[in-house]
Amino acid sequence: MISGSGSRTPSNRLYLSPVRPTMQNKRRLLREYRSYDDLSEHYRMFGSQSLDSLQDRVDMNPSGCDGLSTDGLDFCSQSHSGLLREHNFKIKSYYYNVGNCVHCRKRIRFAMASLRCRACPLRCHIGCCRQLTVNCIPQPQIGTKRGCLSDYAPRVAPMVPALIVHCVTEIEARGLQQEGLYRVSSTREKCKRLRRKLLRGKSTPHLGNKDTHTLCCCVKDFLRQLVHPLIPIYHRRDFEEATRHEDRLAVEMAVYLAVLELHQAHRDTLAYLMLHWQKIAESPAVRMTVNNLAVIFAPTLFGDLDLTLENVVTWQRVLKVLLLMPAGFWSQFLEVHPLPTSLGSTYDFEDRYNHRHWDSSSNLGWSSVKTYFRSMVNLSSTHL
């Protein structure tokens, strides 16, 4: 019952809002806890992983600057010898298109501080950056891919496509004790699906759950479907004549000159694959000798044009000589060059795509505005 002065009786006060006592109890309950650790999991806003990541973020940014720049900090571990280039990380919080960490495969939480490489599409947790074994492969130029090797290779040396680097790294990490690499085939559908995912290049793939034979078939299919083979037709004669010398030093000098005549993407990819196949030939558990590798990859490296028995035998002989070259010979072609300024800290991987879309949309808007004013001027002149 409400009195004349407008005040409510205690009996009616209980029926005003059934939610109010519950909120008061929660506030009283929260005031009883003095620290965040005393709260139960039900009342916590962040999990333990988020708190650790936020603490790492504070430790890496002691000055408290707003830019959150990570220049000069050593994130990547030097223990993994397969890394061709160190990642150039940038701290970023994602509010849309949130993905998974490349290393642990766990979800990067909404608005949580994480690391993203400026040169490649790699994203990971801050705590996982020192355990990464994924190579940093800068993305190729944005444009239509016509099937040439240079279309899939980065713009800086070593110009090896990301598909080959990621597959080779995973094969060497898990498959050097597995028999029949590059000899045992996989299903065509699995290989095709993996190749499309790797060539799309929108995110760094996780290949830990892929079969090693599928990875090997993906490498072979990629080399077979190139418009120009790894050793182009107009360079066959140079390699054939270089391997006919009897003196070992003469052969090495002639092969060196023949390799230098190749395009840089072909040269770097050939050197990278030779080092990989040499490791496979040296592993007794794989049971793939130099002769077996030459038989398998001779038609793939030289192309299927003029595929006669005599040419295949010649290509196998050339490939045997290339595989028997010392590892230091091929390592000299894989020198890591610094990234250009367009891929530096001020103009990174995602900014290239955003900048392109912004330019296209702004140009369309400006042309429409100019068209509108021109039409208005023409309309006014006709009425005059």
UniProtKB/Swiss-Prot annotation:
The lineage of its organism: Eukaryota, Metazoa, Ecdysozoa, Arthropoda, Hexapoda. Involved in the morphogenesis of the adult appendages. GTPase-activating protein for p21-Rac. Promotes the exchange of Rac-bound GDP by GTP. In pupae, expressed in imaginal disks and only in the male gonad. In adults; isoform 1 is the predominant form in the testes and is expressed at a low level in the ovary and somatic tissues, and isoform 2 is very weakly expressed and is detectable solely in the testes. It comes from Drosophila melanogaster (Fruit fly). One of its GO terms (cellular component) is centralspindlin complex. The keyword Metal-binding applies. Keywords: Developmental protein, Differentiation, GTPase activation, Guanine-nucleotide releasing factor, Metal-binding, Spermatogenesis, Zinc, Zinc-finger. A zinc finger (Phorbol-ester/DAG-type) spans 86-136. PANTHER family: RAC GTPASE-ACTIVATING PROTEIN 1. This is GTPase-activating protein RacGAP84C. It comes from the Eukaryota. Pfam families: C1_1 (PF00130), RhoGAP (PF00620). InterPro entries: C1-like_sf, PE/DAG-bd, Rho_GTPase_activation_prot, RhoGAP_dom. The record marks 183 as: Arginine finger. The keyword Zinc-finger applies. GO terms for biological process: cell differentiation; compound eye morphogenesis; mitotic cytokinesis; mitotic spindle midzone assembly; Rho protein signal transduction; spermatogenesis. GO terms for molecular function: GTPase activator activity; guanyl-nucleotide exchange factor activity; small GTPase binding; zinc ion binding. Residues 147-330 form the Rho-GAP domain.
